[in-house]
């Protein structure tokens, strides 16, 4: 009998202990347990995930996993995800030039001025600086809010952008293995910059950097995933937020804001069947079926497990911001005519087994009901009006659009380095950083309330 390590995700509202108890005992003679669903043997736990109400990890054969999927309590059964940098979504007084033909690092983050104005201050002159003396003026700076950058790589811990106005670093050298149920997380050396990622550093700089970011006084945290099991990707953040005491001044816990400029990817290759709007339409990729993808033929692939992880984390009160993706796909809600569009592949797609549906209009799996999904507002104009970037995912599940093209922010090569990048990865920390300012004023807001604010106040 060949067993594999599987992650089981339950639908919301079911008792995890009950199903684990059924699996951990031999139920051969128990007539109340369906042997066509629960194996007639004692199943071994791999990780009971005590920090989670809906997730646990067990050892099953492939056949047993298929049968267990028929349990009405079970939403998904997948092999554990392994982080891949392929999932990344990127392709003050300053020069505020918005659109540039070549990289220009003398500029500021043009999103700082675009996102505080109802209109396009550049007019048709997006390749020019704004008038002399134009500044980004602010009084909110994210004080009292904890910002977490969530990604595989760490950002450069010693970069000057993490300093406050007095030159003191706001980076909290937090050891995640001090949290309950997180003892297996490796200790982080916050003096070691080896392996720091440019993408992570740039994104963090846009959210909380002292020059390029919004939340210039938020506390800054990092949880790099390259060396972590999937079990800790969200459980550690849940435990972090649970452990907070109520602030006697505000009457609430310090808000936790997480920015995630990544998403699980799949390829429009090795296709054996395409299901489009309820019908099989062959096995050849076509834009007629909403199959576009990026230049490498990739799209964001949904999994129930990652969705459940995010939803459970947000149920704890954590605010989560997710990049829409740069794969030119439509993202939609359940009930949309394209929500169930999927392909069947002859090979596995990471945690998705060969032969199982790979949905291509749901976005990446790490999107919960209260997640704010951010698209890329282009720096250039189309027919003299502002528009989304051509590569950005679009559709009704994109909540808000923010500056994401020609964005200057921090780089990982040294402590003062900056560079320019494009993508929904760059848009997302704009909104996460602005949300730190909103939560500074409204620390008791739930994730649903904050997302509603964006819906009500975006234009």
Describe the function of each predicted region.
Residues 27-118, 326:
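Autoinhibitory propeptides
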Residues 70-73, 208-212, 238-246, 263, ...:
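Sec-exported extracytoplasmic/periplasmic mature domains
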Residues 61-64, 89-149, 188-190, 301-305, ...:
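N-terminal domain-start motif of subtilase-like serine proteases
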Residues 225-366, 413-429:
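Substrate-binding/access-modulating region of protease and related hydrolase catalytic domains
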Residues 151, 346-440, 444:
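Extracellular S/T/G-rich loop segment that most often corresponds to the catalytic His/Ser-adjacent loop
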Residues 13-14, 82-83, 152-156, 162, ...:
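Acidic glycine-/aspartate-rich tracts in secreted/extracellular proteins
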Residues 108, 125-235, 250-257, 266-270, ...:
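Subtilisin-like serine protease catalytic core
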Residues 2-11:
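Short glycine-/aliphatic-rich beta-strand segments at the starts of folded cytosolic domains
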């Amino acid at each position: 009998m060949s067993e594999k390590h599987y992650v089981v995700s339950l639908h919301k509202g079911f008792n995890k202990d009950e199903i684990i108890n059924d699996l951990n005992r031999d139920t051969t003679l128990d007539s109340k347990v369906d042997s066509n669903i629960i194996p007639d043997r004692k199943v071994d736990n791999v990780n009971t995930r005590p920090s989670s109400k809906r997730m646990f990890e067990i050892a099953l054969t492939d056949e047993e996993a298929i049968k267990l999927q028929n349990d009405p309590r079970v939403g998904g059964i997948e092999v554990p995800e392994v982080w891949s940098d392929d999932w990344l979504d990127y392709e003050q007084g300053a020069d505020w030039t918005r659109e540039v033909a070549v990289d220009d690092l003398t500029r500021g983050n043009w999103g700082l001025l675009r996102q505080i104005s109802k209109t396009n201050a550049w007019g048709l002159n997006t390749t020019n600086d704004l008038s002399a003396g134009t500044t980004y003026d602010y009084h909110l700076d994210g004080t009292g809010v904890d910002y977490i950058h969530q990604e595989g790589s760490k950002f450069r811990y010693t970069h000057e952008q993490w300093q406050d106005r007095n030159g003191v670093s706001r980076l909290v050298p937090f050891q995640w293995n001090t949290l309950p149920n997180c003892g297996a997380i490796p200790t982080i050396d916050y003096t070691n910059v080896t392996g720091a990622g440019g993408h992570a550093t740039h994104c963090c700089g846009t959210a909380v950097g002292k020059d390029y970011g919004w939340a210039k006084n938020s506390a800054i945290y990092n949880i790099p995933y390259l060396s972590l099991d999937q079990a800790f990707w969200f459980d550690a953040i849940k435990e972090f937020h649970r452990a907070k005491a109520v602030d006697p001044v505000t009457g609430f816990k310090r808000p936790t804001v997480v920015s995630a400029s990544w998403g699980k990817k799949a390829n429009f290759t090795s296709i054996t069947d395409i299901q489009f709007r309820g019908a099989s339409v062959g096995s050849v990729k076509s834009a007629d079926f909403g199959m576009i993808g990026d230049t490498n033929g990739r799209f964001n692939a949904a999994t129930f497990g990652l969705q459940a992880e995010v939803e459970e984390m947000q149920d704890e009160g954590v605010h989560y911001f997710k990049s829409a993706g740069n794969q030119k796909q439509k993202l939609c809600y359940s009930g949309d005519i394209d929500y169930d569009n999927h392909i069947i592949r002859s090979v596995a797609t990471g945690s998705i087994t060969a032969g199982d549906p790979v949905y291509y209009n749901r976005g990446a799996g790490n999107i919960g009901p209260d997640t704010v999904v951010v698209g890329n507002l282009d720096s250039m104009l189309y027919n003299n009006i502002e528009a989304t970037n051509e590569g950005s995912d679009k559709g009704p599940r994109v909540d808000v659009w923010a500056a994401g093209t020609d964005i200057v922010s921090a780089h990982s090569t040294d402590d003062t380095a900056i560079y320019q990048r494009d993508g929904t990865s760059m848009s997302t920390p704009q909104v996460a950083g602005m949300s730190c300012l909103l939560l500074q004023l409204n620390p008791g807001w739930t994730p649903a309330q904050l997302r509603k604010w964006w819906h009500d106040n975006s234009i």
